[in-house]
Amino acid sequence: MKAGIHPAYNEISVICACGHSLKTRSTHKGDMRVEICSSCHPFFTGKQKLMDTAGRIDRFEKKYKASRVGKAAPTT
């Protein structure tokens, strides 16, 4: 490899908004701040919220049922 053309590879701190901090190596200069990390992300913590899609569909149909009454299905 050619000398002098590669960026410096230094140890930096990655600091999350939740307060968790970790050390890594990067060409980034200075500390890096992130909004979410594996310590606070719902997928990794097991506190994942599942969406109730069946309930959402029922609410949609209930809301727009009145506008569909009396309309014939389109013919193609």
From Swiss-Prot:
Required cofactors, per record? Zn(2+)
The family database entries (InterPro entries) matched by this protein are listed as: Ribosomal_bL28/bL31-like_sf, Ribosomal_bL31, Ribosomal_bL31_A, Ribosomal_bL31_sf
* Gene encoding the protein: rpmE
- Domain of life where this protein originates: Bacteria
Q: Name one GO biological process term.
A: translation
In the record's cofactor note, how is the cofactor described as bound? Binds 1 zinc ion per subunit.
What Gene Ontology molecular-function terms does this entry list? metal ion binding; rRNA binding; structural constituent of ribosome
UniProt protein name: Large ribosomal subunit protein bL31
The question of whether Metal-binding is a record keyword is answered with: yes
User: Quaternary structure per UniProt?
Assistant: Part of the 50S ribosomal subunit.
**PROSITE patterns listed in its UniProt record:** RIBOSOMAL_L31
The record's function comment reads: Binds the 23S rRNA.
Q: Which NCBIfam families match?
A: L31, PRK00019.1, PRK00528.1
- UniProt keywords, alphabetically: Metal-binding, Ribonucleoprotein, Ribosomal protein, RNA-binding, rRNA-binding, Zinc
Q: Which sites bind Zn(2+)?
A: C16, C18, C37, C40
The answer, when asked if DNA repair is one of the entry's keywords, is no
